[in-house]
A protein has these predicted regions:
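Conserved radical SAM core fold
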Residues: 155-163, 194-197, 207-226, 252-257, ...
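Flexible, acidic/Gly-rich N-terminal and inter-domain linker regions that tether
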Residues: 1-88
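Structural preference for beta-strand elements that scaffold enzyme active sites
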Residues: 150-154, 186-188, 206-210, 245-249, ...
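Local cysteine-cluster metal-coordination motifs and their immediate loop/turn environment
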Residues: 93-110
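Catalytic cores of alpha/beta
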Residues: 258-273
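Auxiliary Fe-S-binding modules of radical SAM enzymes
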Residues: 1-28, 271-359
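Conserved, mostly hydrophobic/aromatic
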Residues: 102-105, 211, 248-251
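Conserved Radical SAM active-site core
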Residues: 71-84, 107-210
Length: 359
């Protein structure tokens, strides 16, 4: 279930759903030229595509939808939402959805079922909004756990920017925006896909890329269509050399027999492969698994093997999300002990690595 190394192995666009207004945007015209052979299907809204969103029958075409379908839309609500963990703000998304199919992903919970990539073509409006928003913030008043100098904007909450960058220049435009036009802030995103084209972007330390990592054995089961873990680790030194700040996102942490021993192996690989420059700037984020009852039921139709480790009622409890969704997480006391174990392991085996947060 692990793909090859290029975006072409992930995407073979045969159909493009698009809002009619997108044709007035240069970014849309560039994408349509790139995928000139695709069938074009006009839709009133990128949110209202019945055969893709909220349609239970689409579970049978889960992977093919993500590989063969692209949606072009216009981001209408531009707002930067406050955050307190990986960033100070969550920026307006340049995309929504993903070509990868991680079985635990929260994005399909919000939009429904396969949720292939939607590219928002009004990137100039998004950039202009961010330019104004950052200007209003002034200088970061004090060093905090997020950054010691800059306001940080998350740009990839609803997708994987490394994959998006294989479709169009939205991500490049945002990297250039923060590098050239926004002096008091940087951007960040997490990724499970190695796109070496990003090494040409010259971010000048104004982009923090967070490589999502977990033990390879578990990744093979649940990280469907993503870059193998060792390949992600292999490029971390290259990204630091190319001017990125490189962090790691230990997420999601999944409990199973032998889980901590597998994390030791992953940490050993990091210690062996990372050079001193990468180690000295490394920060980790640790996030334990949260799952969802509806997504569990969908997964049972296309990837039931993963649910054997993701859906563990005997050690999980109900958690209601801010939007009212019925989610599950590890039981409070059980989870605290596991978090403490992993944090202790990281501090012991990776003394150079600060932990931004763990929960």
């Amino acid at each position: 279930m692990l793909h090859k190394k290029t975006i072409e192995d992930l995407l073979d666009i045969k159909e493009i759903y698009m809002e009619p207004e997108v044709l007035s945007y240069q970014r849309a015209r560039e994408i349509l030229e790139k995928y000139a052979g695709a069938k074009l299907i006009e839709v009133p809204s990128h949110w209202k595509i019945p055969e893709l969103h909220g349609f239970a029958g689409s579970v049978e075409d889960w992977i093919s939808n993500k590989k063969n379908i692209l949606v072009l839309g216009i981001k209408k609500s531009l707002q930067a939402r406050p955050n307190t963990r990986s960033s100070h703000f969550v920026a307006p998304s340049e995309s929504n959805g993903c070509t990868m199919s991680c079985s635990y992903c929260y994005v399909p919970r919000r939009k429904g079922y396969a949720n292939p990539i939607t590219i928002f073509v009004n990137i100039e409006q998004i950039c202009n909004y961010l330019r104004r928003h950052a200007a209003r913030q002034g200088v970061l008043p004090a060093e905090d756990h997020i950054d010691d100098k800059y306001w940080v904007y998350e740009i990839g909450e609803n997708g994987d920017c490394s994959a998006d960058a294989g479709i169009c220049d939205n991500v490049r435009d945002l990297v250039n925006l923060f590098k050239n036009d926004i002096s008091n802030a940087k951007l960040t995103f997490a990724t499970k896909f190695v796109n070496r084209e990003l090494l040409t972007y010259d971010p000048q330390l104004k982009t923090r890329i967070r490589f999502s990592l977990m033990p390879q054995k578990m990744s093979k089961l649940v990280d469907v269509r993503t870059t193998p873990i060792s390949d992600r680790i292999d490029v971390m030194n290259d990204f630091v050399a190319a001017g990125y700040e490189v962090n790691v996102n230990f997420s999601p942490v999944i409990y199973y027999n032998g889980w901590l021993e597998d994390w030791e192996l992953l940490i050993d690989e990091l210690n062996e492969k990372l050079n001193e420059k990468t180690k000295q700037q490394l920060v980790a984020e640790i996030i334990f698994l949260t799952h969802n009852e509806q997504l569990h039921e969908v997964n049972m139709a296309w990837h039931p093997k993963a649910e054997e480790v993701l859906w563990r009622p005997e050690i999980q409890e109900i958690k209601y999300s801010e939007t009212g969704g019925r989610n599950v997480r590890y039981k409070r006391g059980f989870k605290k002990d596991r978090v403490d174990e992993l944090v202790e392991l990281v501090y012991k085996r990776m003394p150079y690595c600060r932990i931004r947060y763990a929960f």
